[in-house]
Regions:
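Short beta-strand element of Class I
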Residues: 34-35
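Conserved N-terminal Rossmann-fold NAD(P) cofactor-binding segment
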Residues: 38-74
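Rossmann-like NAD(P)-binding element
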Residues: 61-116
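Conserved small/polar residues in nucleotide/adenosyl-binding loops
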Residues: 166-172
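N-terminal Rossmann-fold NAD(P) dinucleotide-binding loop
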Residues: 19-20
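Glycine-rich Rossmann-fold phosphate-binding loop(s) that bind the pyrophosphate
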Residues: 15
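Rossmann-like NAD(P)(H) cofactor-binding subdomain of soluble oxidoreductases
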Residues: 92-157
């Protein structure tokens, strides 16, 4: 991840399991100097930011905090993890409709404050929501990326390791 280096500001929108895990990884590896967590549930974002600060006290220095869209000014990278999880019995089409509405409300707000950032969309279903993010934001498509099939690739690697009795890293 050569793009994210010291001196860079990263904003993570969505402080749920995925957003918090991404934020923690960025902090523990020292891949940015500023890390902002934004969530509609402000106490959740605050709690996750505190957990990351306390959990990385002996790691490279990263300024971790919670905030609002306006605090994302000068972000170099924005990671979007918003959306609801699929409920039992819910179709992927219904999930897509719900999460597209959420994306349509988030993107215009964040792009007001971070129009020059690169965006990584991690929300599900990622391909549709990446397209939605581009459409509703007006951002240059070259600056908006979907996480794509990373999870599928990880699952394949895990299965290959299990059936071949080898370490996960043997299948890179």
């Amino acid at each position: 991840m050569d793009f994210v280096k010291k001196g860079k500001k990263v904003t993570v929108i969505g402080a749920g399991n995925v957003g918090a895990s991404i934020a923690f990884t960025l902090a523990i590896k020292g891949l940015c100097s500023e890390l902002l967590l934004v969530d509609i549930n402000k106490p959740k974002a605050k709690g996750e930011a505190m957990d990351i600060m306390q959990g990385t006290a002996f790691c490279p220095a990263v300024d971790v905090r919670d905030g609002d869209y306006a605090d994302a000014v000068n972000s170099d990278l924005v990671v979007i993890t918003v959306g609801i999880a699929r409920k039992p019995g819910q179709t992927r089409i219904d999930l897509c409709k719900t999460n597209a509405k959420i994306m349509a409300s988030v993107m215009p707000e964040i792009t007001k404050y971070a129009p020059n950032a690169c965006y990584i969309i991690v929300s599900n279903p990622v391909d549709v929501l990446t397209y939605e993010a581009i459409q509703v934001s007006g951002l240059n498509p070259k600056h908006v990326f979907g996480s794509g099939t990373v999870l599928d690739s990880s699952r394949l690697r895990t299965c290959l390791a299990a059936v071949s009795y080898t370490h996960l890293r043997a299948h890179e």
